[in-house]
Each structure stands twice: as C-alpha cells, then as structure tokens.
C-alpha cells in the first residue's frame, strides 16, 4: 500500500490497508538467504521506503543497522516519495547501505497542471528540494566507483491534463537539474497504462492519443540532451568501476554490470570470459551506457 494513495494512474490504493513488515521478520528472511550464500539484497516492492512504520527514522535504523552488520556486497532500497525526503533518513541509508543505491522518485510530471489534475504526490519544487538533499548527503563516490545514494526520476506521459507544453516543462526542469550539477542516476520515461479501478481508467487513452506524435520527440530530446550529459558527470572518463560482472558477448565486445538496483551497462572492446568480475576504467560514454577498459582480470 501507499500512505499517499491518490495518484490517478496508480494501483496501490486498490490494495489492502497500508502494512509494514516487522524488522525481525525481514532480518530472519535475509539471514536465511545469507546462510545459503546470498550477499546481495534489495529492500524493495514498497511504494516508499522512507514511509516505513509511519515515516519513522528510528524504525528505519532498527531495520537497516542489523542487516549492515552482515557486511553484504550490496544492500539497496527502492521507491521514495520526494516529499518525505529529509536529511535524517537519507543519512541512515548512506550509513547502512552500500554504494550505487538509488531512490526512485515518482515525480511523474513537472507540469503543475498535470500534478494537480492527477493528484500526484509531489510538486516540482518539492522534487528539486529532495534531489538536492540526496545529492548533498549521498553524492560521495564509494569503493566500487559509484556514488553512495542518488535519486532517480520517473516520468509518465499521457496523464490527464497533459498538453504540448508538458514535454517542454519536463525538459526545462531536467535541464535545470543538469545545469546545477545535481546528479540523477537514471530517468525512466514511460507512457501511462489506464487500469481498472484507477482514476485514469475513466480518462482512458485520450491524452496518450492527443500527444502520441510528441512522445518520442520528448523522450529522445531527454535521452540526447540530458541523459548523455548526466552520464558524463556521473562517471567521468577515468572513473574506476570495480567488480563489473561480465554477462554477454556481442561480436567481439563484452557487456557487464555491477550488482545493484539500476546498474550501468559497461561495454568492453574485447571478448572477455563471462561470469567473472573485472575492474574497469571508463574511457567513453554512449547515450545510456559506458565504455571501459579492463584493469584487472
């Protein structure tokens, strides 16, 4: 469930009342997997990690502290509602979790008309404030080469009240974030799916159809002019990314990722042995991936 429970397109309000698992149950489950050899975990599938047990920093620390003592390779969280971001809870995530962690923000739109008509859970100004807080506290680079904790943004197109100006407004806010040198780990761009029981079900695909011709133009502009420049700030040339797990070959090239919630795709111009970790130095950038050279095998 979700403590907000009002966004027009979301199915969370259709579920039962908001419930939280007890820390002990979560600890026992993680320990059981740990004893079987697992060292990588994500505390996911919740609408907002920061809302745990009534937006309670003490309860969040009781959850994270014992898990961190297991010295895991990876401990990441999931979604965060921007309006619930503060320094205290952010510091707990940075203290107890591992680097490469991402707070997925359901901003959905920076167009205030769309925000109001769809009862979205955050305003543009609130989202920017949350981005600044997480950058301030989580923006230091960790041992594996990635930052400890950064925001990610979800954008949804086709919502009620969307107009031709919506794409421009979204771009302007993203450009402002980029110009202020605030880091976003990733930007998810999707089209809404009206589902039964949601407010968007009654609206249907009216706005999707209305702006269909604009969607790919908006999306591609963000990918080329925001994502690409953001990636160069996120992992500049010379950055060392450690423990990249090589997964697939494409011709004479190898592609891998670090363990994590939203790991970067790293391409290497060599046919490397797969299912093996490598330390990689970043030498170039693609639109949404990076090119590296292996330092150690």
Task: Please tell me what each predicted stretch does.
Residues 1-25:
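Canonical Radical SAM [4Fe-4S] cluster-binding loop centered on the CxxxCxxC motif
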Residues 2, 26, 105, 153, ...:
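Conserved, mostly hydrophobic/aromatic
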Residues 5-9, 113, 196-200:
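Short acidic/His/Gly/Ser-rich catalytic and metal-binding motifs that mark active-site loops
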Residues 11-14, 30, 45-47, 79-81, ...:
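Active-site proximal loops enriched in glycine and acidic residues that flank catalytic Cys/His/Asp
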Residues 31-165, 173-176:
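Conserved SAM/AdoMet-binding glycine-rich loop
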Residues 32-36, 174-184, 192, 272-287:
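C-terminal, active-site-flanking charged/polar segments
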Residues 53-58, 64, 175-242:
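Radical SAM enzyme [4Fe-4S]-AdoMet core and its adjacent flexible, acidic
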Residues 209-297:
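Terminal RNA-binding accessory module
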